Amino acid sequence: MFNRRLLRHVRYAFQQVRSNHSLQERIDAIPIERYRNFSIVAHVDHGKSTLSDRLLELTNVIKPGGKQVLDKLEVERERGITIKAQTCSMFYQDPRTKLDYLLHLVDTPGHVDFRAEVSRSYASCGGALLLVDASQGVQAQTVANFYLAYSMDLKLIPVINKIDLDIADIDQAEEQVENMFELPKSDCIKVSAKTGLHVEQLLPAIVDRIPPPTGKVEKPLRALLVDSWYDSYLGVVLLVHIVDGQVKRGDKIITAANGLKYEVRECGIMYPDRVATNTLKSGQVGYLVPGMKESKDAKIGDTLMHLGKESITEVLPGFEEPKPMVFVGAFPADGAEFKALDDDISRLVLNDRSVSLQRETSNALGQGWRLGFLGSLHASVFTERLEKEYGSKLILTQPTVPFLIKFKDGEKKIITNPDDFPDLSLRRSNLESLEEPFVEAIMTLPQEYLGKVIQLCDDSHGVQKEITYLNMTGQVMLRYELPLSYLVDDFFGKLKSVSRGYASLDYEDVGYKQSDIVKLELLVNGKSVDALAQVMHRDQTEHIGKEWVKKFKKFIKSQLFEVVIQARANNKIIARETIKAKRKDVLSKLHASDISRRKKLLSKQKQGKKNMKTVGNIQINQDAFQSFLRR
């Protein structure tokens, strides 16, 4: 039995080696002039991942019927969104010339929170398929991703998807592509990624219209580090675009950013999973296993070079690491699980380098972490992965944005925890200004909902920048400048609500601007509950403060003494609720006529309750915080 199993393993390993060898031979036979690196530009849910599956089927990378092959995370498949950019190599034989082409597809996220993933992916591409849903037309993220691709000089091929739907308006979609992006209608390829209709027309178009990489294999190695992930067996795996030169197993390499030296233990292509090859050469997108132990050593946008050749190698421009813009406090639902949860969060952060992690302690909730994310969806996805992959339960505080504090002596400070927000006395003395991040939001919506959407933006302290009526489509595109704090407070949900789900949203940062902001605190018997503090615009504090005290009152149990719940902003109490004390019947054993004894006992009880209120420590259980923080 053992020998049979061993034989089966040996036979499988031999087949893998033979398969990898034939793959390498096929790659070696294709010159760089027949490489095509491309991506797919689209709005969320316009069919990127489905189209990727059809292309992989057509090139025999996967068997027909595979679903969302490049969406490898469970949460990606469940939500139907792409979170991590993935790459896959394909071989395509052009039926017109019988020549083999090596295609590298990078499937990118569509949601604005993962824009950094998109820009990194475009850096290794020569062109892109611009995907538009025939039933919805051009949407906000289509526009934003188009301009990003255009600014990076990508050759764009317009593709109209979902033409099989009854509500598809192909003519309108083509008009929008021509009017908004100045791409001729005649260039549009009309497909149905779901059924596979006309998808085969895309491969010749990719070969004909997208230029090959321009690198030279004889030059010194220059590899652009596009992404990284952590593997428990291999350590950090690097996704790289080989701009010039070539790299093979056993090569010594050095990083330009921090001068760290490594030996390449394995290199290869994604097909769609890792397949080891002898060499990666100029123009290819593949992976390297350098024996790197920590993800923080992999600086995205870094240049990898051959050791000893760094003096004659020009470093690539690279790109800026994204900065977290949404912060939440995270605490274990059970304080005893802190150590296990700390390990789980650390492991997950290894694979999501854009999350910032810092330990913090709350008087109310104990030990926890301050987590920084790219946006609200990013935060939601991270916590969902933590629950599903590790079974961890968290209490999350309300999301907040980073605030910039400028002092009169020229010092600047970024505040990510509302509890650190300066109090009124400091503000009067040493403070020059309080600033918050703003974004420019792009919204596309049907004209009939314009009034309600404008009202929502105005209520969110927005400033209108531009309004464009899209020709003959009944659609409007709005540009508004908004505080990011309103955007993370479920602005997208409110936008969907007032537009009945028809509006789409995209945004980009425009920097910090001065605002009239204050800290709103919840006090219980005069003590601030630090985990519940929030920074907001002054005109929000009164109605939110009243909501807070009413809501929190529901979750506090009656005590033997009076409990006072207050909301305080700018050192001023703006709302109050009182939970009356439980009353013990101290008169039950008295005779009805003993009036003096009756008065004495009631006076003693009153004084006792007063003393208890002064020194009493109210125990607020974790369920109360969870219920209060739940929307």
UniProtKB/Swiss-Prot annotation:
Q: Which UniProt keywords apply?
A: GTP-binding, Hydrolase, Membrane, Mitochondrion, Mitochondrion inner membrane, Nucleotide-binding, Protein biosynthesis, Transit peptide
* HAMAP family referenced in this protein's UniProt entry, alphabetically: LepA
Task of the protein: Promotes mitochondrial protein synthesis. May act as a fidelity factor of the translation reaction, by catalyzing a one-codon backward translocation of tRNAs on improperly translocated ribosomes. Binds to mitochondrial ribosomes in a GTP-dependent manner.
Tell me which Gene Ontology terms the entry assigns under biological process: positive regulation of translation; translation
Where does this chain mainly localize?
Answer: mitochondrion
Q: Does the keyword Electron transport apply?
A: no
SUPFAM superfamilies from the xrefs? EF-G C-terminal domain-like (SSF54980), P-loop containing nucleoside triphosphate hydrolases (SSF52540), Translation proteins (SSF50447)
Question: How does the entry describe its membrane topology?
Answer: Peripheral membrane protein
PROSITE patterns under this entry?
G_TR_1, G_TR_2
For this entry, the transit peptide stretch runs: 1-19
By sequence similarity, the record places it as follows: Belongs to the TRAFAC class translation factor GTPase superfamily. Classic translation factor GTPase family. LepA subfamily.
Q: Where in the cell is it found?
A: Mitochondrion inner membrane
Mind telling me which GO cellular component terms the entry cites? Answer: mitochondrial inner membrane; mitochondrial matrix
- State the reactions this protein catalyses: GTP + H2O = GDP + phosphate + H(+)
E.C. numbers: 3.6.5.-
Supply the name of the protein: Translation factor GUF1, mitochondrial
Specify the tr-type G domain's residue ranges. Answer: 33-214
Cite a single GO MF annotation.
GTPase activity
Give binding positions for GTP. Answer: 42-49, 107-111, 161-164
Checking PANTHER family in the record gives: TRANSLATION FACTOR GUF1, MITOCHONDRIAL (PTHR43512:SF7), TRANSLATION FACTOR GUF1-RELATED (PTHR43512)
Which Pfam families does the entry link to? EFG_C, GTP_EFTU, LepA_C
| InterPro entries with a match to the protein in the record | EF-4 (IPR006297), EFG_III/V (IPR035647), EFG_V-like (IPR000640), G_TR_CS (IPR031157), LepA_C_sf (IPR038363), LepA_CTD (IPR013842), LepA_IV (IPR035654), P-loop_NTPase (IPR027417)
